[in-house]
Structures are given as structure tokens and as C-alpha cells.
């Protein structure tokens, strides 16, 4: 169906760019069961006297495939002196691939400091991050868990209908480049 509609558009005298806002990866074990790390539970076990808030940007009511679990999380730490210790504990979790303090995360990923947590985490390719097991009802999943938000879901299609483009000269193309290529091709 998708190919049919793209074909119809391509027949017109237009510049056409097809891309996506993000990729999607399976987040299950070999039995098809969800792979999730619940960071708030983990931190409360390691630091029972302290308060943490794990924020998952993916959390929304549409839980059909991702169960409100994503590959990206921000952690707010009440006791700021604990941040280096919390960072070290999270780095020990093999399924967490990237753990950065706020300053490094903002610099590396161009995040706004005033809206970022004290710690930023990203899971490995086949795992998701949740806050607390009690906050994620995975029984409503009808399909195997899939999600996005991390380093492994950045790859997206980028299709253009022009051979006049200089796209092959680009080392890195982002989905937000679609507007540039659509307008650039229109002028040729």
C-alpha cells in the first residue's frame, strides 16, 4: 500500500522526500518477553534513604507496542552529592549503554540544560528503560515489545526522487534535512 501511494506521488512533477521521525527496535528476549530495566526500583534498592525521579520522554497513553518503556531516560537526584555515586552504580548495569551527567549529555546530544535531568541514560539495543515495575502494566501489550529513543533507533529511511541531488556527498543525513532537500531539488 505504501509503495502504491509513493508511486502515485512520484508520477507528479514534485520534489518528494520520504523519511521518519525515528526508528524502532524489538526489545524482547529470545522467548519474546519484554526486556526492561526499572531504574527507579534499582536506585531505591542501592540508595534506600534517597529520592530519585526517573523521567521517560516516551511515556504516553499509546502503549500498544512500547508499554511506555523507551531507550532513553533522565534521572533527577534529590541529593546532588550522590550524583557521581549514582552514575557509577548505573554504569555497572550491562544493559545500560550510555550514562552521562547533565553537562556531558547536553553537550553531546544538544539537549537543553534547563529541561534535562541530572543523569541521562540510554539502554542497549534490545533493552528498554522503565521507572518502576509498578508503573508499567505490560499485560496490555498484544504484540512483542518494540520501542525507540536510544542510539540504536536513530537510523531512518531517507528516500528522495531526484538524481540531481548532492545527497551522496553528505557524510551524515538527518530526518530534519528533508526540507532542505525537497526545496533544493525544486530549484533544479
What are these regions (language model features)?
Residues 1-188:
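Feature captures the catalytic ectodomains and active-site-proximal regions of enzymes
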